[in-house]
Amino acid sequence: MRSKVTGAKRWVVKIGSALLTADGKGLDRGAMAVWVEQMVALREAGVELVLVSSGAVAAGMSQLGWTTRPSAMNELQAAASLGQMRLVQAWESSFGEHGKHTAQILLTHDDLSDRKRYLNARSTLRTLVDLGVVPVINENDTVVTDEIRFGDNDTLAALVANLVEADLLVILTDRDGMFDADPRNNPEAQLIYEARADDPSLDAVAGGTGGALGRGGMQTKLRAARLAARSGAHTIIIGGRIERVLDRLKAGERLGTLLSPERGMLAARKQWLAGHLQTRGTLVLDAGAVQALRQANKSLLPVGVKTVQGSFRRGEMVVCVGPDGIEVARGLANYSALEAQKIIGQPSDAIESILGYSAEPELVHRDNLVLV
């Protein structure tokens, strides 16, 4: 089972507030430096990495001399605004010592619920990762409201794992993993090393709330693992203060709690595509494109499309039919119907000259395509 960790090519690492602060007295630069050293080693080993970092509110509280996390939204947002600057500067400085750059991305629930903004965020993250930059993601606490907040960065990290199609979500916390009883009260409590994310028995042992500086307890981490599992990602809940924790995970050590999805990534994603989205338009393909989809598992390129029917936006589901009108596949369009009308029948390298930009070389990528 741990081969799923050692073989994972794309990690989302989430670090909680309790780990990032020095007893509530500002950011723990020493601890951050140790994690950065390990994350740089992961990058150099070929692992694509996205960091979800808590700590903005906690850092701001320290600057303001507050010892208790405020409940008023305006005070939380003020602390986040002050602390976010220091948090990002600390990450950039630490990664910079190893010749790596970071990029700040602040998200709200609206960014991931709106399909167009979701696709734009995914495209930006993929580009940053391809460039060797480490994206540092946090919730945009300064502008978010109760109605649209993620609630905790565990949930945000799971949604980011879905967004970037990560193989592995690593949630670093102040506990060594999930136990079959509360280890703070029961010295006989045993660490749960491996389980299915959807195992209902886990709910009984995941009680409890977050600490003074954060919002997420073990129950939120379990929910995050289940959310990540929807796209086929594995989740490890593990103690962030374990020595060389990321190095040892990569080496295959049996640490923390590994929660596995029911299905593999591609199977989970394609089941979701097949059953959960309403179709908005139709693409009529030529015989060559039909053969490429059915026999070679290829993406659908504009050159293989003869006509566009219906009205759809980027990211919406379209039906792909052959010259005989029989449905071949369905998938998510990378371009709107109006844009698709302009580029069909054309080679992919002509997209930019026709539209003035190029979002993707494919009209529908094979990972977003389900054969029927």
From Swiss-Prot:
Broad enzyme group: transferase
Query: Where along the chain is ATP bound?
Result: 14, 173-174
Catalytic activity, EC: 2.7.2.11
List the Pfam families hit by this protein, alphabetically: AA_kinase, PUA
Catalytic reaction list: L-glutamate + ATP = L-glutamyl 5-phosphate + ADP
Q: Which PROSITE patterns does the protein's record reference?
A: GLUTAMATE_5_KINASE, PUA
**NCBIfam families in the cross-refs:** proB
Q: Which family does it belong to?
A: Belongs to the glutamate 5-kinase family.
The identity of this protein, by name, is Glutamate 5-kinase
Which species is this UniProt entry from? Pseudomonas putida (strain GB-1)
